[in-house]
């Protein structure tokens, strides 16, 4: 006998346990906002930290918005009107002089009377949206919004340009590469569904079996590349990526800067060492440079006051070989040399014959009795030739 227990649902058919997603097998991927220093206004539209093009696009749009609000603030300021005095007959009735007068947008001569004030009634006041207070409020909102947007754009631009090491960018790049590798492995183990994919040989055009490892690897790479080129993945990166918090970002950045300072200090100590030794080496180097300059000056002075060929030859020039070619110092060009005479005196073949002593000797091979007994009896013993010596006599 079997016992059936109905699921714990209410009258509406809803699951009371709250495990509907788990029972249906649907796994919801949590989405985390991408970090930034000045793009918090865009919320989930902020791209991944390694998407430089997307970050610069949002920075440009935010800068344009800030400039628009600042321009609206400037447009709502009180305008000064430029009038000529001749346009006011009550002020220039008996005079022919003229001049410029700057007045505000509200007539300052309303108390003096005039046709422009006939339409106004006693006790009439403008509405709230036309009042100065509302205009001032709008100007304050425009100015504050524009300044905040421009400052945030400047912060994000400084992060993208001034920071040599960005932990958020490094993490986003690493997570993106890891997702691509995991996708390749997952698609490879999933295999290829013949109903969805048809693999053909590019050379012959024949259909290939989908269970071949090479085919599975190629299809897995193609699917991983397609997933990586998805517009959402390219903009936001892996959706399940949880970026570093602000405190972790600052800790990693501080650690990087401290490491750079430590390495720089170690390099400086290795190069310079003790300050006293550095000063001593610097003084010795300066003294050596000064001595070299003095020696060059003295040598140049001696060469200037000495006639040509007045200096003795260098000791290295005197120390020559026995059959070195010695030329007359009076010869200044190759035309002054007698080639036949030089060839007869310094014949290189004669020098080679004098320096060469060649002797060739053929010596018999000496074998021990044990070696002779170990050989087979039918092995013929070759007769050894007498030693021959060839000597090349010097010519």
UniProtKB/Swiss-Prot annotation:
Q: Name one Pfam family in it.
A: Mgr1
Q: Where is this region: Disordered?
A: 1-27, 372-395
Topology in the membrane? Multi-pass membrane protein
The record places the following residue ranges in the Mitochondrial intermembrane compartment, namely: 1-52, 157-395
Residue spans of biased composition, Basic and acidic residues class: 8-19
Keyword Mitochondrion, does the record have it? yes
Q: Which residues cross the membrane?
A: 53-70, 140-156
Cellular location of this protein? Mitochondrion inner membrane
Q: Does the keyword Transmembrane helix apply?
A: yes
Give the family, as the similarity comment puts it: Belongs to the MGR1 family.
Self-association state and partner proteins as the record states = Component of the mitochondrial inner membrane i-AAA protease complex.
What this protein is called in its record is Mitochondrial inner membrane i-AAA protease complex subunit MGR1
Organism in which the protein naturally occurs: Eremothecium gossypii (strain ATCC 10895 / CBS 109.51 / FGSC 9923 / NRRL Y-1056)
């Amino acid at each position: 006998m079997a016992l059936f227990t109905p699921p714990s649902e209410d009258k509406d058919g809803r699951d009371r346990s709250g495990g509907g997603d788990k029972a249906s097998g649907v796994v919801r991927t949590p989405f985390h906002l991408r970090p930034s220093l000045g793009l918090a206004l865009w919320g989930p539209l902020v791209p991944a930290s390694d998407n430089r093009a997307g970050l610069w696009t949002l920075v440009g749009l935010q800068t344009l918005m800030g400039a628009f609000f600042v321009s609206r603030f400037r447009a709502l300021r009180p305008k000064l009107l430029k009038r000529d005095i001749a346009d006011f007959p009550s002020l220039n009735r008996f005079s022919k002089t003229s001049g410029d007068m700057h007045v505000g947008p509200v007539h300052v001569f309303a108390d003096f009377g005039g046709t422009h004030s006939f339409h106004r009634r006693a006790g009439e006041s403008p509405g709230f949206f036309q009042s100065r207070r509302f205009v001032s409020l709008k100007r304050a909102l425009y100015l504050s919004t524009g300044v905040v947007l421009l400052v945030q754009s400047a912060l994000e631009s400084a992060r993208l340009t001034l920071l040599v090491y960005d932990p958020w960018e490094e993490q986003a790049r690493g997570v993106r590469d890891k997702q691509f590798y995991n996708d390749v492995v997952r698609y490879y183990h999933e295999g290829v569904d013949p109903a969805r994919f048809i693999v053909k040989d590019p050379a012959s055009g024949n259909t290939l079996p989908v269970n071949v490892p090479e085919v599975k690897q190629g299809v897995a790479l193609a699917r991983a590349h397609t997933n990586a080129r998805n517009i959402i993945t390219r903009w936001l990166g892996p959706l399940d990526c949880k970026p570093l918090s602000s405190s972790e970002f600052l800790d990693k950045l501080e650690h990087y800067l401290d490491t750079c300072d430590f390495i720089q200090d170690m390099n400086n100590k290795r190069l310079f060492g003790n300050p006293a030794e550095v000063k001593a080496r610097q003084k010795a180097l300066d003294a050596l440079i000064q001595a070299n300059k003095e020696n060059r000056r003295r040598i140049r002075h001696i060469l200037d006051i000495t006639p040509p060929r007045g200096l003795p030859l260098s000791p290295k020039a005197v120390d020559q070989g026995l059959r070195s070619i010695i030329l007359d110092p009076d010869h200044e060009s190759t035309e002054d040399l007698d080639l036949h005479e030089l060839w007869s005196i310094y014949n290189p073949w004669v020098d080679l014959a004098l320096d060469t002593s060649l002797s060739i000797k053929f010596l018999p091979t000496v074998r021990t009795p044990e070696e002779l007994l170990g050989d087979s009896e039918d092995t013929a013993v070759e007769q050894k030739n007498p030693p021959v010596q060839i000597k090349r006599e010097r010519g």
